[in-house]
């Protein structure tokens, strides 16, 4: 790639650091940006900077937000008795798009994965337990993925939350085994939520 100007090489290098973006895709993206207007390139750079500066984790649910608490946690019309536990903020967005869940959320920021060095202390499980002590929550809906890690996380949560006096349910199958919630269509997510069961 030494035949490209150093600034273009650097842009390709930075783009290739993004997940799922290899060197060839980064090169195509960089060339596309250069073919566009300076105004479009500046708007892209500004939107990246703005998102990096303003988006943070909500101190209640740990979802992505530009205010604290986030708009979902502040919404008094939502069911305050039910909290849906998800792995990532993208899972929360997928459930919101389905329109099937009207409660609040708790984002773990991952799932248990001993092979990758992710244990309970690396997730927002302690915060969930504290939240259950402070708030009048009647049901926790565990909506982790159906991968081995997602199922392990669900089982761990069941063990940790047993005896808390809170009903613990798991979304039903319907989400494909090994699938991520963010790639599941809205109808499948709605059916999975409607058919949730006790752990």
Curated annotation (Swiss-Prot):
SUPFAM superfamilies assigned: Recombination protein RecR
Cross-referenced SMART domains: HhH1 (SM00278), TOPRIM (SM00493)
Matches recorded under PROSITE patterns: RECR, TOPRIM
Gene Ontology biological-process annotations: DNA recombination; DNA repair
Pfam families: RecR_C, RecR_HhH, RecR_ZnF, Toprim_4
Zinc finger (C4-type): 58-73
Stated family: Belongs to the RecR family.
Protein name according to UniProt: Recombination protein RecR
Protein task: May play a role in DNA repair. It seems to be involved in an RecBC-independent recombinational process of DNA repair. It may act with RecF and RecO.
GO MF annotations in UniProt: DNA binding; zinc ion binding
Database matches in HAMAP family: RecR
Keywords: DNA damage, DNA recombination, DNA repair, Metal-binding, Zinc, Zinc-finger
Matching NCBIfam families: recR
Ranges of residues in domain Toprim: 81-176
Signal peptide region: none
InterPro entries: DNA_Rcmb_RecR (IPR000093), Hlx-hairpin-Hlx_DNA-bd_motif (IPR003583), Rcmb_RecR (IPR023627), Rcmb_RecR_Znf (IPR015967), TOPRIM_dom (IPR006171), TOPRIM_RecR (IPR034137)
